[in-house]
A protein has these predicted regions:
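Short glycine/proline- and charge-enriched loop/turn segments
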Residues: 24-33, 173
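Short intrinsically disordered, low-complexity coil segments enriched in acidic
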Residues: 1-8, 133, 150, 192-193
Length: 194
């Protein structure tokens, strides 16, 4: 803030809000972020400009999603077709295949269907006619991982806001995401510079 006076107000005893790095590992020398983990240049231009101004070191990061549900009886990932069918028995599992069909339907139709600002995610799933496997083994775990929210609360989220987030972060596409980055040394590195 070369031309402005800035006052930081923080409720906690430390600065950073959800940017929290803890040291882990056998020697306690491995930084692990527990809140703010990744960002991309497409969706966070102000943050990335601040990082550039402050000289915050960043590195590319891989972001993918995988799920292990029902005590490991059903597992899959989204990084590749091989990951989707990590358990080859799912190739012949009609419920798993319907879940994949519902993923494609959701990705294709959610943006147009979620125009009503009063619609919840639960209402959106009903309107799209997706099945319980899609809800329980795809959307709820994915959304819960993104927002660190218990699965039982996701269905009450406003559909339009969540679907816009998915669209902005290329989560409604099966052709790829934005390149993700992380702060080298953990988010504490940018908090120290602020």
């Amino acid at each position: 803030a070369a031309t402005h006076d800035v006052t930081l107000i923080e409720a906690a005893g430390r600065l950073g809000g959800h940017a929290r790095t803890v040291m882990a590992g056998k020697r306690g020398d491995q930084p692990v972020d527990t809140g703010f983990i990744v960002f991309n240049y497409a969706n966070y231009p102000q943050l990335t400009a601040m990082f550039d101004d402050l000289g915050v070191p960043v590195v590319k990061s891989d972001m993918s999603f995988g799920a292990s549900v029902m005590g490991g009886r059903m597992e899959y990932g989204l990084a590749s077709l091989r990951a989707v069918f990590a358990q080859t028995r799912n190739i012949a599992n009609p419920r798993f295949l319907r879940m994949l069909r519902d993923v494609m339907r959701f990705n294709a139709r959610a943006l147009d269907t979620a125009q009503d600002s009063n619609m919840t995610i639960g209402g959106l799933l009903e309107a799209l006619g997706t099945g319980p496997w899609f809800r329980d083994y795809y959307l709820l775990p994915l959304s819960g991982a993104i927002w660190s929210t218990p699965k039982d609360r996701i269905l009450d989220f406003p559909a339009d806001a969540m679907i816009r987030f998915f669209e902005n972060h290329a989560l409604l596409s099966h052709t790829g995401q934005h390149q993700w980055y992380t702060v080298q040394g953990g988010s504490i590195e940018y908090v120290r510079r602020v």
